[in-house]
């Protein structure tokens, strides 16, 4: 019976993981309509410049683009710096 429980519980976990991934994809597509196509490249380049000086995880960099009206665009950049600054020069 334990073997059966193992396989059944795994399906529930797999379903939850798939559901979360699908929600992320849907949210990205909704948000992606207003983003310029160069934003992923810009984020990658900004991360590369920051990594020249401080070693950070890519998850510590958040870039958000917001359109306010027809002629105003806001690019918000949040970088979480590590507590111990590891200089990589």
UniProtKB/Swiss-Prot annotation:
Pfam entry (one): MinE
Keywords, alphabetical: Cell cycle, Cell division
InterPro entries: MinE, MinE_sf
Coiled coil: none
Any one biological process term the GO annotation gives: cell division
NCBIfam families: minE, PRK00296.1
Similarity section: Belongs to the MinE family.
Function, in words: Prevents the cell division inhibition by proteins MinC and MinD at internal division sites while permitting inhibition at polar sites. This ensures cell division at the proper site by restricting the formation of a division septum at the midpoint of the long axis of the cell.
Protein name stated in the entry: Cell division topological specificity factor
Organism expressing this protein natively: Serratia proteamaculans (strain 568)
């Amino acid at each position: 019976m334990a073997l059966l429980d193992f396989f059944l519980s795994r399906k529930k976990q797999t379903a939850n993981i798939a559901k979360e991934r699908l929600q992320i994809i849907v949210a990205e597509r909704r948000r992606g309509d207003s983003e310029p196509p160069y934003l992923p490249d810009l984020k990658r380049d900004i991360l590369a410049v920051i990594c020249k000086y401080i070693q950070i995880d890519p998850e510590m960099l958040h870039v958000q683009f917001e359109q306010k009206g027809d002629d105003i665009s806001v690019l918000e950049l949040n970088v979480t710096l590590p507590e111990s600054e590891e200089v990589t020069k």
